[in-house]
């Protein structure tokens, strides 16, 4: 049985040097909200709460976590790492319905789920990827994201200089512009 003894939450906020333009808006900040759950063995499990957009989504989710989740997580116990997800997802159904905010609550529950699985794997002394799939690779590929269409060549060059070989650019504005951007990258 895993007993959660301590909770820490970290809100990171980074001002973008160049705002990221996407089909759903302009991102001037990048936020990351990380939950750390510490158990009776002093193991830490980490989970990230999705809060990429809008700009202040991280602070909003931080406040929801403090107001609704933190006290429930204190002294929370679980044996199966799937149990916390089910418990917290169901626990806030009425609030999600009343507020109409399914997204933020679900994002937080997902972050808790990741932290619980991480904690479970550490108690089993098994890397999480191997716990979930013993045949999973030891290394994963990464990609560069947040690349605006009008500066994709410069950003892709920067990423390549860091050893990154895969890229994700923003599309979804105008079909002809999107095709033109993708064709220029293909030639690039």
Task: Identify the meaning behind each predicted range.
Residues 1-57:
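Structured beta-strand/loop patches that form or line metal/cofactor-binding pockets in enzymes
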Residues 13, 94-98, 133-137:
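A short alpha-helix capping/helix-coil boundary motif
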Residues 34, 118, 156:
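Short glycine-/small-residue-rich flexible loop motifs, especially phosphate/cofactor-binding loops
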Residues 38-123:
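Metal- or metallocofactor-binding catalytic centers and their adjacent structured scaffolds
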Residues 65, 84, 88, 108, ...:
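General structural feature for long, well-ordered alpha-helical segments within catalytic domains
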Residues 130-188:
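Metal-dependent enolase-superfamily TIM-barrel catalytic cores that perform enediolate-based chemistry
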């Amino acid at each position: 049985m895993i007993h959660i003894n301590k909770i820490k939450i970290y809100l990171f906020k980074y001002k973008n040097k160049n705002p990221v333009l996407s089909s759903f808006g302009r991102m001037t900040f990048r936020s990351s909200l990380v939950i750390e759950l510490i158990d009776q063995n002093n193991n830490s499990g980490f989970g990230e709460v999705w809060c990429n957009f809008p700009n202040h989504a991280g602070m909003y989710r931080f406040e929801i976590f403090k107001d609704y989740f933190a006290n429930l997580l204190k002294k929370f116990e679980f044996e199966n790492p799937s149990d916390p997800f089910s418990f917290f997802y169901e626990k806030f159904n009425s609030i999600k319905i009343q507020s109409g905010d399914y997204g933020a609550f679900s994002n937080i529950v997902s972050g808790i789920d990741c932290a619980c699985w991480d904690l479970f794997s550490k108690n089993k002394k098994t890397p999480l990827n191997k716990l979930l799939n013993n045949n999973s690779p030891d290394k994963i590929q990464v990609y560069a994201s947040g690349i605006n269409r009008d500066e994709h060549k410069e950003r892709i060059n920067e990423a390549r200089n860091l050893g990154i070989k895969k890229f994700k650019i923003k599309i979804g504005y105008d079909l002809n512009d999107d095709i033109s951007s993708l064709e220029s990258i293909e030639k690039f």
